[in-house]
Amino acid sequence: MKVYCLLVVLLVGLVSQTQGQLDKKCNMACTLDYRPVCGSDGKTYPNRCALTSTACESQQSITVLHDGEC
């Protein structure tokens, strides 16, 4: 039982640390400049930074299809 509890504590710590690293990596300071781009997910983003930030946070591969709205 002690071993099980120890494994649970270690697993929770590992998940928390991994999420913290992801949050730091994706924490981008994007400007409010409106230079729309069309993402490969079919959504219009206000600028390239916003697209990159969304892709990082959602852990998806979203690329710029073209400048301008979709």
Curated annotation (Swiss-Prot):
Keywords for this protein: Disulfide bond, Ion channel impairing toxin, Neurotoxin, Protease inhibitor, Secreted, Serine protease inhibitor, Signal, Toxin
Site positions for Reactive bond = L32, D33
* Signal peptide span: 1-20
Q: A Gene Ontology molecular-function term?
A: toxin activity
The residue stretches assigned to a coiled coil in this entry are: none
The protein's predominant localisation is secreted
Q: Where is the Kazal-like domain?
A: 21-70
| One cellular-component annotation, GO | extracellular region
**What is its subcellular localisation?**
Secreted
Disulfide topology:
C26-C56, C30-C49, C38-C70
Q: Which Pfam families match?
A: Kazal_2 (PF07648)
Q: Give tissue specificity per the record.
A: Expressed by the venom duct.
Q: Name one process (GO BP) from the record.
A: cell differentiation
Relay the domain remarks: The cysteine framework is IX (C-C-C-C-C-C).
Function comment: Acts as a neurotoxin by inhibiting an ion channel. May also act as a serine protease inhibitor, since it possess the kazal serine protease inhibitor signature.
Which family does this protein fall into?
Belongs to the conopeptide P-like superfamily.
> In its UniProt entry, what is this protein called?
Turripeptide Pal9.2
This protein's species is Polystira albida
